[in-house]
Design a protein with these regions (language model features):
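Short secondary-structure capping/turn micro-motifs that flank functional sites
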Residues: 57-58, 106-107, 123-124
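Catalytic cysteine-centered active loop of the rhodanese-like fold, especially the PTP/DSP P-loop
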Residues: 62-108
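Glycine-rich, highly charged phosphate/nucleotide-binding loops
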Residues: 52-60
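Flexible, polar/low-complexity N-terminal or interdomain linker segments that lie immediately upstream
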Residues: 1-32, 37-43, 116-129
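Conserved beta-strand positions in the Rossmann-like core of class I SAM-dependent methyltransferases
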Residues: 31, 50, 98
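Short phosphate-binding/catalytic loops that engage adenosine nucleotides
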Residues: 28, 94-96, 112
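Short, hinge-like loop/turn segments at secondary-structure boundaries
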Residues: 50, 68, 114-118
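Short loop/helix-cap segments at secondary-structure boundaries that form the rim of catalytic
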Residues: 41-47, 107
Length: 129
């Protein structure tokens, strides 16, 4: 694999907060999947996200998810591999997947709101890219 192919592949498998928000705002079929434990989801998550902890993912727990949507798993951030584990399981189950870069942490750093008992309001968009 060349370096160019590596970066092209990376963009095929990952998505950042700004691109997720733009896709959602455009009405694209994107479903955010919070792969953390239910308690973490209740404390704070991305608006519209579904709670589906990666440890519970199976054909049964994902049966209601649409096959034509892009599923975007996320977890706390770069120190957490829950979204990667979730992406693997979702791919094995036949879904189309892109992992959210930086997870919930980078979502908030980019200025987007969260919901839950520890929700934060949206701020000015911080992403400089």
């Amino acid at each position: 694999m060349t370096q160019l192919e590596f970066y092209q592949a990376k963009l095929a498998y990952e998505i950042d907060a700004a691109d997720v928000k733009a896709a959602l705002d455009a009405g694209e079929k994107v479903i955010l999947i919070d792969t953390r434990a239910a308690g973490a989801f209740e404390r704070e998550t991305i608006p519209g996200a579904l709670s589906l902890p990666h440890r519970t993912m199976s054909a049964q727990t994902t049966a209601a998810l649409p096959r034509d949507a892009l599923l975007v798993p996320f977890c706390d951030g770069i120190g957490c591999n829950g979204s990667t584990n979730g992406a693997i399981k979702l791919l094995q189950l036949g879904f189309r997947v892109k992992e959210l870069q930086g997870g919930l942490d980078w979502w908030k750093r980019d200025g987007y709101a969260t919901v839950g008992s520890h929700a934060v309001a949206a701020t000015s968009i911080q992403c400089a890219c």
